[in-house]
Protein backbone atom coordinates (compact mmCIF):
# COMPACT_ATOMS: atom_id res chain seq x y z
CA UNK A 1 0.00 0.00 0.00
CA UNK A 2 1.28 3.45 -0.94
CA UNK A 3 0.04 6.95 -1.64
CA UNK A 4 1.64 6.67 -5.08
CA UNK A 5 -1.45 5.30 -6.81
CA UNK A 6 0.11 4.83 -10.25
CA UNK A 7 2.66 2.38 -8.87
CA UNK A 8 0.36 0.68 -6.38
CA UNK A 9 0.32 -2.55 -8.35
CA UNK A 10 0.59 -5.96 -6.73
CA UNK A 11 1.98 -7.73 -9.78
CA UNK A 12 3.21 -5.21 -12.39
CA UNK A 13 2.93 -6.33 -16.00
CA UNK A 14 6.31 -4.84 -16.93
CA UNK A 15 8.30 -6.24 -14.01
CA UNK A 16 10.45 -8.47 -16.25
CA UNK A 17 11.31 -5.49 -18.47
CA UNK A 18 12.16 -3.39 -15.40
CA UNK A 19 14.53 -6.06 -14.11
CA UNK A 20 16.11 -6.41 -17.57
CA UNK A 21 16.66 -2.64 -17.71
CA UNK A 22 18.15 -2.68 -14.22
CA UNK A 23 20.54 -5.50 -15.12
CA UNK A 24 21.43 -3.99 -18.50
CA UNK A 25 22.20 -0.59 -17.01
CA UNK A 26 23.92 -2.01 -13.93
CA UNK A 27 21.40 0.01 -11.95
CA UNK A 28 19.25 -0.94 -9.03
CA UNK A 29 15.66 -1.31 -7.96
CA UNK A 30 14.84 -0.16 -4.45
CA UNK A 31 11.91 1.10 -2.40
CA UNK A 32 11.00 4.36 -0.71
CA UNK A 33 8.49 5.24 1.97
CA UNK A 34 5.43 7.43 1.53
CA UNK A 35 7.15 10.00 3.75
CA UNK A 36 10.16 10.04 1.39
CA UNK A 37 7.84 10.33 -1.63
CA UNK A 38 5.98 13.32 -0.15
CA UNK A 39 9.24 15.01 0.80
CA UNK A 40 10.51 14.65 -2.79
CA UNK A 41 7.10 15.73 -4.12
CA UNK A 42 7.31 18.98 -2.16
CA UNK A 43 10.99 19.51 -2.98
CA UNK A 44 10.59 19.27 -6.75
CA UNK A 45 7.61 21.63 -6.61
CA UNK A 46 9.38 24.20 -4.43
CA UNK A 47 12.83 24.08 -6.06
CA UNK A 48 12.00 23.37 -9.70
CA UNK A 49 8.37 24.48 -10.04
CA UNK A 50 7.40 21.06 -11.37
CA UNK A 51 4.01 19.64 -10.38
CA UNK A 52 4.33 15.86 -10.40
CA UNK A 53 2.12 13.12 -9.06
CA UNK A 54 3.42 11.13 -6.07
CA UNK A 55 4.36 8.19 -8.32
CA UNK A 56 6.75 10.40 -10.29
CA UNK A 57 8.20 11.76 -7.06
CA UNK A 58 9.15 8.19 -6.07
CA UNK A 59 12.16 8.22 -8.40
CA UNK A 60 13.35 11.52 -6.95
CA UNK A 61 12.83 10.13 -3.45
CA UNK A 62 15.00 7.17 -4.39
CA UNK A 63 17.76 9.46 -5.63
CA UNK A 64 17.65 11.49 -2.41
CA UNK A 65 17.77 8.27 -0.39
CA UNK A 66 20.79 6.97 -2.30
CA UNK A 67 22.58 10.30 -1.87
CA UNK A 68 21.98 10.19 1.89
CA UNK A 69 23.37 6.64 1.96
CA UNK A 70 26.39 7.80 -0.11
CA UNK A 71 25.58 5.24 -2.80
CA UNK A 72 25.70 7.58 -5.80
CA UNK A 73 28.62 7.29 -8.21
CA UNK A 74 30.63 10.49 -8.47
CA UNK A 75 31.62 10.04 -12.10
CA UNK A 76 28.20 9.30 -13.63
CA UNK A 77 25.27 11.33 -14.90
CA UNK A 78 22.03 10.40 -13.17
CA UNK A 79 18.66 10.96 -14.81
CA UNK A 80 15.29 10.69 -13.09
CA UNK A 81 12.34 10.76 -15.46
CA UNK A 82 9.18 12.34 -14.07
CA UNK A 83 6.32 11.71 -16.47
CA UNK A 84 3.28 11.84 -14.20
CA UNK A 85 1.68 15.29 -14.07
CA UNK A 86 0.37 16.37 -10.67
CA UNK A 87 -3.12 16.78 -12.12
CA UNK A 88 -3.37 12.97 -12.33
CA UNK A 89 -3.53 12.73 -8.54
CA UNK A 90 -4.46 16.09 -6.99
CA UNK A 91 -5.69 14.74 -3.67
CA UNK A 92 -2.22 14.78 -2.14
CA UNK A 93 -1.54 18.39 -3.02
CA UNK A 94 -4.91 19.37 -1.61
CA UNK A 95 -4.22 17.45 1.59
CA UNK A 96 -0.70 18.79 2.06
CA UNK A 97 -1.04 22.42 1.03
CA UNK A 98 -1.79 25.38 3.24
CA UNK A 99 -5.24 26.91 3.26
CA UNK A 100 -5.59 29.32 0.32
CA UNK A 101 -5.78 33.05 0.92
CA UNK A 102 -9.11 34.45 -0.23
CA UNK A 103 -8.94 37.97 -1.59
CA UNK A 104 -11.46 40.21 -3.35
CA UNK A 105 -11.39 40.43 -7.13
CA UNK A 106 -9.05 43.40 -7.21
CA UNK A 107 -5.78 43.53 -9.16
CA UNK A 108 -4.04 45.88 -6.70
CA UNK A 109 -4.96 43.75 -3.68
CA UNK A 110 -3.92 40.55 -5.49
CA UNK A 111 -0.57 42.10 -6.46
CA UNK A 112 0.03 43.15 -2.85
CA UNK A 113 -0.76 39.65 -1.52
CA UNK A 114 1.75 37.99 -3.87
CA UNK A 115 4.39 40.62 -3.15
CA UNK A 116 4.35 42.62 -6.37
CA UNK A 117 3.46 45.95 -4.72
What is each PLM-predicted segment?
Residues 1-51, 95-117:
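Active-site/ligand-binding loops adjacent to catalytic centers
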Residues 38-45, 49-65, 76-78:
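Substrate-binding/catalytic subdomain of NAD(P)-dependent oxidoreductase enzymes
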Residues 7, 11-13, 36, 56-58, ...:
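Glycine-rich beta-alpha junction loops
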Amino acid sequence: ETIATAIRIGNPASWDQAVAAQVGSKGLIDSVTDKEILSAYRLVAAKEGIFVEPSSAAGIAGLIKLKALKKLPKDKTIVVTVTGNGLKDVQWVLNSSTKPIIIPVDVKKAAKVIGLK
